[in-house]
Amino acid sequence: MRFRCLVMDHDDTTVNSTATIHFPSFLAYLKLVRPEASYTLEDYFRKNFDPGIMALFTGELGFSEEELEGEFRFWQDWVRTRVPSAYPGICEILRRHKDAGGYIAVVSHSMRESIERDYRENDLPEPDIIFRSEEHTSE
């Protein structure tokens, strides 16, 4: 085996989470705090990358500190109760790598509990280590 460790992102690499979990959560929260606002999935993807989600929230949408905290709690609750599907073929890729003696590392902004649950619920091989990229530490 040439590369023993396969380093995976989680959202939208291993599981289809933005379209099925994060964007619907965003729309549901907007309905509560900015009912006049309207975004498509494409808008949401684009603005996540430029200017970034926080700039969207604080700039374009003008969220207050209270609304930012509310959005984060709302999103966490939403994510806890919904499991995104793994992309077709990803299980086979990960299993083949593990069966050959390789390691799987996940680097993500997602919560550790969500990553572990998503792997378990999609019957994916358990990652050997999970790094939360925003904290720059492993959990």
PLM-predicted stretches and their roles:
Residues R2-P88, A100, E113-E116:
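N-terminal helical cap/lid subdomain that shapes the substrate entry/recognition surface
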Residues A28-Y29, R96, E121-N122:
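Alpha-helical structural signal in soluble globular domains
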Residues C91-D99:
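Surface-exposed amphipathic alpha-helices with a cationic face
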Residues D99-G101, L124-P125:
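Short, well-ordered coil/turn elements that cap or connect secondary structure elements
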